[in-house]
Amino acid sequence: MIALLDRYRYEIEMFTQQLGLLTSTESELAAAWDFLGSFGEVKEGDDILVPVGGGVLISATVTDPEKVIASIGMDIQAEMDPEAAAERIGERRDRIREMIQQVRAGIEQREASSTALQQQAEAAYMELQNARGAPTI
């Protein structure tokens, strides 16, 4: 019973770490999606602030507002129009959000199982103490 409780605690910890990574990724994707949403108003020659991660922005001059470079997976980037990039990022963000929900559900399930198992262990201990006639806590 104790080994199973330890396993649940370990799994909860792993899921919590995974949730942190997914939440960070979702935030990055949301920021990129928001940026691309406002990019349609930009004209050639405009100075803009470009988010580069970690809360850092750099100043840049737009040379072609019809093209952006976006990740298409596996560390490969491709040139595309801002709308297509926003759509890809939105789809990735939605998949990450689904994964976040699944991980949260996994955490909740393990926490519920852990709580139930802990209550069973406490009840068994109390029953054992009562059978021995020892004082209970």
Regions found by a protein language model. Give the residues of each.
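Intrinsically disordered, low-complexity regulatory regions in eukaryotic proteins
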Residues: 1-72, 76-137
